[in-house]
């Protein structure tokens, strides 16, 4: 096997998986109190309003996102995360899944949650 093929296989093996769900399924996931609900938006966005039941806020755009997440979320935890519209949360989801967390990402983000009439704080 060539070195190029070995590199390709290693890259394929490194792909990370996380579930992308819509609002109703995200709400069902949140009903399990052991799930860590994580807001990955900026501090200003979080302060302006967040999904009721959010347990943790870590801005995915900050350079220390990974280290803060590992320090604050128990290894092996199920993490349900969201951002404003579903873009930044995919980045956070991939990062956390790569670290061994079971990750569920809200496809439509906080905006979709609000549009669905779900509770916010």
Task: Report each predicted region and the residues it spans.
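Rhodanese-like catalytic fold shared by cysteine-dependent sulfurtransferases
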Residues: 2-29, 43-78, 87-121
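Short, surface-exposed ligand- or partner-binding patches at beta-edge/loop junctions that are enriched
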Residues: 82
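Short hydrophobic beta-strand that contains or immediately precedes a catalytic carboxylate
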Residues: 36-41
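Short, high-confidence coil segments that cap the C-terminus of an alpha-helix
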Residues: 34-35, 76
């Amino acid at each position: 096997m060539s070195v190029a093929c070995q590199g390709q296989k290693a890259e394929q093996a490194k792909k990370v998986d996380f579930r992308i769900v819509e609002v109703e399924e995200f709400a069902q996931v949140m009903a399990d109190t052991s799930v860590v609900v994580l807001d990955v938006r900026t501090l200003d966005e979080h302060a302006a309003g967040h999904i009721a039941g959010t347990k943790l806020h870590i801005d995915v755009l900050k350079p220390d996102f990974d280290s803060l997440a590992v320090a604050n979320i128990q290894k092996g935890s199920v993490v349900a995360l969201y951002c404003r519209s579903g873009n930044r949360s995919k980045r956070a989801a991939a990062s956390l899944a790569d670290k061994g967390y079971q990750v569920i990402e809200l496809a439509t983000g906080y905006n979709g949650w609000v549009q669905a009439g779900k509770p916010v704080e």
